[in-house]
Amino acid sequence: AAYYAFININEYDRQLVEEHNAYWVNINKVPTLLFDHAEMVCKAHHLMRIQATTTPIAFHLLPEHFTLTQLQNLYEAINGEPIDKRNFRKRVAELGYVEKTKLIDKLTSRRGAALYKFNEEDYKKTLKFKL
């Protein structure tokens, strides 16, 4: 049996990782694994892609306020391929539960990027997700 989980990279037990000499690897650059573990990783990645495009789970991997670039980068990492910026932003706007805030991110953008947030209450009213 194999298990996978989406976790926020800022919210894991660092001590546990150090005790087991574990480390993060890029899903597209997984080193050689023993037994059927490579197959398990491929299956988990496939399931993660499905879950990330049919449920809003990815929003829990971002900070409370995020830029659309951060959201797009996350989906590109999960899917392993680039996404057209204009089409992605159009799809996000059509969701109806990703709200633009009045906050501006000046740390990762020279001009200052608008910050957004996921409105879980609005999502629960529709329970429809397709990104």
Task: Please state what every model-predicted region is.
Residues 1-2, 113:
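Broad gene-expression machinery/nucleic-acid interaction feature
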Residues 2-9, 13-49, 64-69, 87-96, ...:
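NUDIX/MutT-family hydrolases
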Residues 53-131:
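Core RNA-modification/binding signature centered on pseudouridine synthases
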